[in-house]
């Protein structure tokens, strides 16, 4: 978005932040600057009970984010729990549970949920992820006569990657992952019952900071 101003406050293990920003998503002309309207706002609260845990809650009140639906505002709510543990110099585990809700009114509320974990050992990592999301008929570009208003989509991913080289605090990794999807029964004629995807990838990322 174009135009964001944020103010934060920290006290011991608590942190509070507030932001004002432009609710409308950028237009199709990606090479210019849209007008900053500062017509939306959000707040976020977080708490670190220990050095390993982070608890977070946030809400955003977004004014007319979609150009095709200019009269619809969105209240977005999120909550998350993050965990990170350094087991020893060569082993590290991290995990996350994240929930979100887009609320456009009584008949248009869409939930999402993410649960993932990553275990890093030496130059190797194994990870898994579960994703759940609700999609509306409009987002899936379905006809008005299509049965149902919201549709549940699930995805289960398992993967492995290995560091090939590291230079200037940047790691180059190679990895592979498999994803199995669970599709709402009303969508199975379009997408199948359990679509499966397989991926091999190269990844550039910052090196893990070591104390």
Where are these regions (language model features)?
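Outer-membrane beta-barrel translocator/channel fold
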Residues: 59-68, 72, 91-112, 125-159, ...
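Transmembrane beta-strands of outer-membrane beta-barrel pores
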Residues: 11-13, 20-26, 59-65, 85, ...
């Amino acid at each position: 978005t174009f135009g964001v101003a944020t103010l934060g406050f920290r006290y011991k293990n608590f942190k509070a932040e507030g932001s004002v920003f432009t609710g409308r998503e950028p237009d199709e002309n990606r090479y210019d600057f849209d007008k900053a309207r500062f017509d939306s706002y959000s707040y976020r609260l977080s708490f670190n009970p220990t050095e390993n845990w982070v608890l977070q809650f946030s809400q955003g009140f977004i004014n007319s984010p979609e150009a095709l639906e200019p009269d619809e505002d969105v209240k977005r709510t999120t909550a998350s729990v993050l965990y990170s543990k350094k087991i020893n110099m060569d082993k590290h585990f991290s995990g996350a549970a994240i929930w979100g809700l887009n609320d456009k009114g009584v008949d248009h509320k869409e939930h999402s949920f993410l649960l993932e974990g990553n275990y890093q050992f030496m130059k190797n990592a194994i990870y898994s992820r579960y994703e759940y999301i609700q999609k509306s008929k409009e987002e899936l570009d379905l006809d008005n006569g299509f049965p149902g208003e919201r549709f549940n989509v699930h995805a289960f991913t398992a993967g492995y990657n290995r560091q090939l080289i590291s230079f200037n605090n940047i790691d180059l990794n190679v990895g592979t992952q498999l994803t199995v999807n669970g599709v709402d029964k009303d969508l199975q004629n379009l997408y199948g019952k359990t679509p499966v995807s397989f991926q091999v990838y190269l990844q550039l990322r910052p090196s893990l900071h070591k104390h």
